[in-house]
């Protein structure tokens, strides 16, 4: 892409800052029976269809069917319109998956059957829907995406009128309504049946919003940026945002065909981005996932920089400038112990939550914090956006590089000294309560005592599949690998008991 420039706009506090809303429930720090030294709150309440980030599964296979989507559309419209004297307006955005058309039409049908108005945004990033829900004063926003999953999966996640993801309690109410249609009352008839319309400039509105989060006194002129949009929702918006701020942009993953989203590209597969950064001698590489709510960055040396490192470097600068609220960073139980120690050295602290960016956001809102995220790359700059936004996070990293006049590799090395961390995924036939897995529980207690204050053990179920995740941290990687193998073997024994 040719280098372009545009007039820099002064950030608009009204459009860049989400509307204030009532605080969400307190954050959850241990998930699905997780065993974690840093656990600070009970696990999220189990629901039938909703997981850690909405409903997700293989498209056209239960639960991710058009039949369920139709029922969900009806339930959302009922809740969004409750107590209002107007037909609820509900936005629908999606990523580039082939199955998105099917799910979109089913949701729209359910909404219209309840008298709701549907605004179709087309393929846009998840954070674009969150922003548009507030800027257009909609009653809800729906995103059809399975994020980083392969193309044959899909999912549905929901934002309230305030631009924030729904809490567990609201999702539980939707499930109850979906399972008992009598609770929804009569369907709309005649002229009260809803209608659907397209929002033609949804991408343009988001591009303007994203650019407003970049400091008006800085310019990306002369900065070389490689963007990998994963053939996903940001395939048009992300390159445009950086180019219009002056960067020389090279674009990867911008030719979606319905089945190539996340395929060997994007945040999960940064190898191609690394090669292109080195080839172009770029200053930074930015890899997004399918719905562009997270990013992984690559420095000028071709080294991958994850969410923990980005949070550490941004927190350090914000503390120095007096901008980090209460000198506190919010992250999940999966973030490296080194991040905790880095915050302590800065005179700050780290608050941990359950896995899932919405639990991070809930903790930020209830605690009055403004920076948080996940190791996986969901980064929330609450002064700018109400949810994780890979494009905006990339802009904040670029602003940090320009402010400090330091290369990304230097910033990352200075900010975070990692503790060795091992992640082991164990596929099992079905989920069982962790407390019922006696061999695993007994060994977990021994391992926790062995690690002491020098390490951590976290054992939790995946939020979307029967996969046990074991995370170990400590000073000796070889010891961690041996312990991880022993724990995995214990879990397999329990699974067959």
Q: Which role does the model predict for each range below?
A:
Residues 93-95, 227-229, 299, 383, ...:
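Short glycine-centered, acidic/aromatic-flanked micro-motifs in structured strand/loop junctions
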Residues 2-13, 18-109, 113-114, 139, ...:
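An N-terminal, well-structured beta->alpha segment
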Residues 85-95, 119, 224-226, 328-333, ...:
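Short glycine-rich phosphate-binding loop at a beta-alpha junction
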Residues 128, 172-208, 300-373, 380-381:
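Proline/glycine-rich low-complexity loops and linkers
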Residues 37-45, 58, 154-280:
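Gly/Ser/Thr-enriched, mixed-charge loops and adjacent short helices
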Residues 53, 92, 129, 142, ...:
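Buried hydrophobic positions in well-ordered alpha/beta secondary-structure cores of metabolic enzymes
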Residues 78-82, 86-153, 240-298:
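N-terminal small/polar loop signature for handling phosphorylated ligands or for N-terminal nucleophile
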Residues 282-284, 321-497:
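Phosphate-binding and adjacent anionic-ligand microenvironments
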């Amino acid at each position: 892409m040719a280098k372009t420039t545009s007039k820099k706009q002064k950030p608009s506090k009204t459009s860049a800052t989400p509307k204030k809303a009532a605080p969400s429930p307190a954050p959850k720090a241990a998930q699905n029976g997780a065993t974690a030294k840093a656990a600070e709150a009970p696990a999220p309440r189990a629901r039938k269809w909703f997981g850690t980030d909405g409903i997700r599964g293989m498209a056209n296979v239960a639960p991710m069917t058009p039949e369920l989507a139709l029922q969900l559309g009806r339930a959302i419209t009922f809740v969004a319109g409750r107590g209002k004297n107007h037909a609820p307006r509900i936005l629908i955005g999606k990523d580039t998956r082939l199955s998105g058309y099917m799910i979109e039409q089913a949701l729209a049908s359910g909404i219209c059957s309840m008298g709701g108005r549907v605004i179709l945004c087309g393929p846009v990033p998840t954070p674009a829907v969150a922003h548009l829900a507030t800027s257009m004063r909609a009653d809800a926003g729906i995103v059809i995406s399975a994020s980083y999953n392969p193309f044959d999966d899909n999912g549905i996640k929901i934002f309230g009128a305030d631009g924030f993801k729904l809490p567990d309690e609201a999702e539980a109410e939707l499930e109850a309504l979906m399972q008992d249609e009598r609770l929804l009352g009569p369907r709309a008839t005649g002229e009260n049946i809803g209608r659907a319309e397209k929002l033609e400039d949804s991408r343009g509105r988001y591009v303007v919003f994203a650019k407003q989060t970049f400091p008006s006194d800085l310019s990306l002129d002369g900065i070389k940026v490689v963007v990998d949009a994963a053939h996903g929702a940001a395939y048009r918006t992300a390159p445009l945002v950086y180019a219009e701020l002056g960067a020389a942009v090279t674009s990867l993953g911008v030719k979606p065909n319905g089945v190539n989203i996340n395929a060997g590209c994007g945040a999960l597969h940064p190898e191609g981005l690394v090669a292109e950064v080195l080839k172009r001698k770029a200053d930074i590489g930015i890899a997004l996932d399918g719905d562009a709510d997270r990013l992984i960055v690559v420095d000028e040396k071709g080294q991958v920089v994850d969410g923990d490192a980005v949070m550490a470097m941004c927190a350090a600068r914000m503390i120095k400038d007096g901008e980090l609220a209460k000198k506190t960073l919010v992250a999940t139980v999966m973030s490296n112990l080194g991040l905790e120690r880095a915050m302590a050295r800065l005179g700050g602290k780290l608050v941990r939550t359950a896995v899932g960016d919405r639990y991070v956001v809930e903790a930020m809102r209830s605690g009055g914090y403004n920076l948080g995220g996940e190791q996986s790359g969901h980064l929330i700059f609450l002064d700018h956006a109400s949810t994780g936004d890979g494009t905006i996070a990339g802009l904040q990293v670029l602003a940090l590089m320009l402010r400090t006049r330091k290369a990304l590799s230097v910033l990352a090395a200075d900010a975070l000294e990692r503790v060795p961390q091992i992640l082991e995924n164990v596929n099992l036939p079905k989920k069982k309560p962790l407390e019922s897995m006696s061999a695993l529980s007994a060994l977990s207690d021994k391992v926790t005592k062995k690690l002491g204050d020098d390490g951590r053990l976290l054992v939790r179920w995946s939020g979307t599949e029967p996969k046990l995740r074991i995370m170990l941290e400590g000073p000796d990687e070889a010891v961690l690998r041996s312990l991880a193998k022993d724990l995995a073997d214990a879990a397999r024994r329990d699974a067959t008991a």
